[in-house]
Amino acid sequence: TITCPKAHGELDIYDALTVSCNCAFAQLAEELGQKKLAEYAEKTGLTRPVDVDGYQTAAGSFDADQQQLGQVAWSAIGQGNDLVNPCAMLNFMGGIANHGKAVTPKLIKKITTPAGIPVYFDIMPSKQTLLNKKTADTLSEMMRNNVVNNYGQSNFGQLPICAKSGTAEVGEGAAPHAWFVGFLQDPLHPLAFVVMVENGGGGSAVAGKIANKVLQEAYNAN
């Protein structure tokens, strides 16, 4: 049985994402089916390993048994046997922010001016398209809506942030993993981010605060 912490009533897709309505996305999952969900998990890179300057990350997985009642719905909301590498999620966030184009990850310790001031650098997008532009831009709008109508813009100061929280249950009585992912809608600060706190608890309450602290430093550095 798929449940939510509270009854949300009738929702459109924007509001369903904003309040993280498990039931809404479970319903969509049942309509789409396991095959289509697995296909797009692969297409968007969420289950593929990511190559970061020659270092290959672990692959993720979307393992939903069509024959097992409720398993497709659970997998569609990131539970069940789902696994996603934070680097793959970061790649996906960059793709959304970049109108559907994946951005090649790079390992960089720091880049500064002679005075020690951090500077930004140009990032060359890879040729891989994760999403079409319309879909990516719609997701950007939805993630911006999350901040304005749920997380609260006041919690992020002047950051033009688009984000989604996640609270991943891990079972065996352990506290859930806290996730907070997204990007800044600012061409002068083209920053995507992923914060995952193992057994940290609620997503926005825990990981969101960490993301905000780091982003404030980066955003106000120049």
Specify the residue positions occupied by each region the protein language model found.
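Short, gly/Ser/Thr-rich active-site loops of penicillin-recognizing serine hydrolases
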Residues: 118-120, 124, 210-222
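Beta-lactam-recognizing serine transpeptidase/beta-lactamase-like catalytic domain environment
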Residues: 1-195
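Intrinsically disordered, low-complexity acidic/polar segments
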Residues: 190, 202-204, 221
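Ligand-site clamp/hinge motif
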Residues: 197-200
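Extracytoplasmic/secreted cell-surface and envelope-processing proteins
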Residues: 25-27, 202-206
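Short amphipathic alpha-helical face segments that pack within enzyme cores
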Residues: 85-91, 206-213
